[in-house]
Amino acid sequence: MDSLANAFDSSSALLNHEIAYVLGQMQDDNAVPHLIERLEDLNEDVMVRHEAAEALGAIGNRIAMGTLEKFASDEEVVVAESCEVAIDLLNWVSSKRLEYSD
């Protein structure tokens, strides 16, 4: 996971988008701070920020909720909409985890 997160230093928006996607699919809580950093970086490509939001939703760690709520009103519509979807997904994923732990 750390090797992927370190690759976020790439200047390629396409590579960074794919890294965010893979981190979301891995559903590793250790990726959350790296994805939050990508989402919060207003200089980051919109495509990367969008995928970081979706990945945070897929991971389902409630630590990301505040950031997702903050950027649900982002001026970039695709980022705002991705955050809204991610909030719903995060709620669903985290509720499923609770069901399985009971």
Regions found by a protein language model. Name each.
Residues I63-L89:
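Preference for long, well-ordered alpha-helical segments
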Residues V22-Q25, A55-A58, A86-L89, V93:
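Core register positions within helices of long alpha-helical scaffolds
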